[in-house]
Regions:
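Eukaryotic partner-binding/assembly regions in large regulatory complexes
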Residues: 1-3
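Conserved Class I S-adenosyl-L-methionine-dependent methyltransferase catalytic core
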Residues: 6, 10-14, 21-54, 58-64, ...
């Protein structure tokens, strides 16, 4: 007995429009792209890449210990178009050089606030189920780094609207 007619019918019942289905799946997985960018930003990967290109080992320096995982992150950044890759060397793109390298005029320092928000949003299911507040501490208790990231994020948002 063939299952094709049955599964085809089920698919039609659940999703009348395959575009809607694809959009739902895409929406469910978009967090992966965000996490790739935020991890690279948090580790300051973009600032570690030299203008002449850098290997994963050079990017790792003394701070990043798992070179294999770093290579996977760099390859994921390459697939997102945030770095270029030639053999074993990684290079900044025009956009990543302009916006993701510390010290540059248009550096998006406020993205660190998104890194901090990740922890809160990751607890959404637990919060809804258990009435748990993900962050109970006051803003002043969150530390200088959190406050600086928050202020920079608000500044970025204000500049965008101006």
């Amino acid at each position: 007995m063939s299952l094709k007619p049955i599964t085809k019918g089920i698919a039609k019942m659940k999703f009348e429009n395959s575009k809607d289905r694809a959009e739902i799946i895409q929406l469910a997985n978009v967090f992966q792209k965000s996490r790739i960018l935020l991890t690279a930003f948090e580790l300051d990967v973009f600032s570690r890449i030299a203008d002449t290109g850098s290997t994963a080992e050079q990017i790792a320096g003394n701070e990043i210990k798992n070179i294999r995982a770093l290579k996977r992150l760099l390859n994921a950044l390459h697939s997102l178009g945030l770095v270029k890759k030639e053999k074993e060397n990684y290079f900044l793109t025009e956009s990543s050089s302009a916006y993701l390298v510390k010290g540059k005029e248009n550096y998006l320092e406020g993205l660190m606030h998104s890194v901090h928000l990740w922890n809160s949003w990751s607890k959404l299911t637990e919060t809804v189920l258990n009435e748990v507040q993900p962050l109970k501490n006051e803003i002043n208790d969150r530390g200088e780094e959190w406050l600086r990231a928050f202020i920079n994020a608000m500044h970025m948002r204000g500049r965008r609207r101006a």
